[in-house]
From Swiss-Prot:
One Pfam family per UniProt: AAA_17
Gene: adkA
UniProt-listed InterPro entries: Adenylate_kinase_AdkA (IPR023477), P-loop_NTPase (IPR027417)
Assembly with partners or alone: Monomer.
UniProt-listed NCBIfam families: PRK04040.1
Catalytic activity, as annotated: AMP + ATP = 2 ADP
Broad class of enzyme this protein falls into: transferase
Domain of life, per lineage: Archaea
Protein name as it appears in the record: Adenylate kinase
Binding site for ATP: 10-18
UniProt subcellular location: Cytoplasm
Length: 192
């Protein structure tokens, strides 16, 4: 297997987790196995253990220093996993906070993970807005299509910066409404 660490990113509601899970399921049928790790879940485990958050979406509102410390601890845990098997990390390129965009993979996390590839899952802002409005399982801040598109632009910028710093390739995968299988096939084609 040529990829030891692959990072799959996207704004909340774009469907990056769904695309990644479906791709992993199909790759297993081909005897290609990645360990799936959700960076936010790893961070939430740390935050919950420290009594800093009771639900995952509260982490966005923690002060930046606390978020950075939690990121570093989660990055170390994932780096340990990648020493034993290829890892696909489900995360966000950037996290929108009240004080601005926080890099999802700052230098101290990138240095640990050293990804081979960064994948950015995207679609139109209005599609994401509609998906978010229909998802009652999450406590998300309401945003406009324009602010979602700005967030996707910031994700692209961050992904390229991650590539510059690590030598990772950057791939954009489109996840249009009703065409998730196309996005899955596009992701699989670069993970083989």
């Amino acid at each position: 297997m040529k990829n030891n660490v692959v990072v799959v990113t996207g704004v909340p509601g774009v469907g990056s987790t769904t695309v990644m899970q479906k791709a992993m399921d199909k790759l297993i049928e081909e005897k290609i196995s990645y360990k799936m790790v959700n960076f936010g879940s790893m961070m939430f485990e740390v935050a919950k253990e420290e009594g800093l958050a009771e639900e995952r979406d509260q982490m966005r509102k923690l002060n930046p220093e606390t978020q950075k410390r939690i990121q570093k601890m989660a990055g170390r845990k994932i780096a340990e996993l990648s020493k034993h098997s290829p890892v696909a990390v489900d995360t966000h390129s950037t996290v929108k906070t009240p004080k601005g965009y926080l890099p999802g993979l700052p230098a101290w996390v990138l240095n640990e993970l050293n990804p081979d590839m960064v994948i950015v899952v995207e679609t139109d802002g209005d599609e994401i807005l509609m998906r978010r409005m229909g998802d009652e399982s999450r406590n998300r801040d309401l945003e406009t299509t324009k602010s979602i598109e700005e967030h996707q632009f910031m994700n692209r910028c961050a992904a390229m910066a991650y590539g510059v710093l690590t030598g990772a390739t950057v791939k954009i995968v489109k996840n249009k409404n009703g065409l998730v299988d196309n996005a899955v096939e596009e992701l699989i084609s670069v993970l083989r």
